[in-house]
């Protein structure tokens, strides 16, 4: 099973979720596009937290900007056809960059590029002012593309807002993230253990 981790925005917990799922599903990891933090990339973080095999990025940029902007600064021409799924027999966790409809190449959106692959999707939403609106808009865009959505992971939401989102979106609840002062291998393993029961039924969760 290949799963794409999409977020309602940047910095909503996608890398943390990716590390947890590589442990839970004994999966490999791939981030197609890395912008900025090349010495402390998301692939390096996931590997350190989970020990998972991490496939090389298709593109690596020196500045933490939208891909098309970062590519321009680094004088790199991006080609959609070079962003291809790694060959592996293992399950694969694929992490997007930024929000679902973040720019990819100069004339494409990330969600449209990744939507071509035969993968399931998980949406990650983090609580902040405006996050419910961003969650509903992102889900609307995903459903408009007829994506196979497994469900949603909610990061630091109060219980009443969790209930509202789940009731309104109709998405299966796949896990909850709490505020963590620091994240370690033990933290990741603890979440993998907590989420085990829900993810046992992942094949029946599609919506």
Swiss-Prot record:
Q: Name one Pfam family in it.
A: AAA_26
Which pathway is recorded for this entry? Answer: Cofactor biosynthesis; biotin biosynthesis; biotin from 7,8-diaminononanoate: step 1/2
Which cofactors are named for this entry?
Mg(2+)
Could you say which residues bind substrate here?
Answer: 35
Annotated GO molecular function terms are: ATP binding; dethiobiotin synthase activity; magnesium ion binding
Instruction: Using the UniProt record, name the top-level EC class of this enzyme in a single word.
Output: ligase
EC number(s) recorded for this UniProt protein: 6.3.3.3
The record's subcellular location field reads:
Cytoplasm
Q: Which residues bind Mg(2+)?
A: 15, 42, 95
Query: What positions does the entry give for ATP binding?
Result: 11-16, 42, 95-98, 155-156
To which protein family does this belong? Belongs to the dethiobiotin synthetase family.
Subunit note:
Homodimer.
HAMAP family from the entry? Answer: BioD
- What is the protein's name according to its record? ATP-dependent dethiobiotin synthetase BioD
What is the protein's species of origin? Chlamydia abortus (strain DSM 27085 / S26/3) (Chlamydophila abortus)
């Amino acid at each position: 099973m290949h799963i794409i981790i999409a977020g309602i925005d940047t910095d909503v917990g996608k890398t943390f979720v990716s590390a947890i799922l590589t442990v839970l599903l004994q999966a490999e990891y791939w981030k197609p596009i890395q912008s900025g933090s090349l010495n402390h990339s998301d692939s390096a973080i996931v590997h350190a937290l989970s020990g998972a095999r991490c496939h090389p990025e298709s593109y690596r940029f020196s500045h933490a900007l939208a891909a098309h902007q970062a590519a321009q600064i680094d004088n790199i021409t991006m080609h959609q056809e070079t962003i291809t799924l790694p060959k592996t027999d293992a399950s694969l966790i694929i992490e997007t960059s930024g929000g679902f409809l973040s720019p990819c190449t100069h004339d494409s959106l990330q969600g449209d590029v990744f939507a071509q692959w035969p993968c399931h999707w998980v949406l990650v939403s983090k609580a902040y002012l405006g996050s419910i609106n961003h969650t509903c808009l992102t889900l609307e865009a995903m459903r408009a593309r007829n994506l196979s959505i497994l469900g949603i992971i909610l990061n630091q939401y109060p219980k009443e807002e969790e209930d509202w989102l789940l009731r309104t979106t109709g998405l299966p609840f796949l896990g909850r993230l709490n505020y963590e002062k620091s994240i370690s291998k033990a933290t990741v393993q603890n979440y993998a253990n907590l989420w085990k029961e829900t993810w046992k039924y992942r094949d029946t969760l599609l919506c």
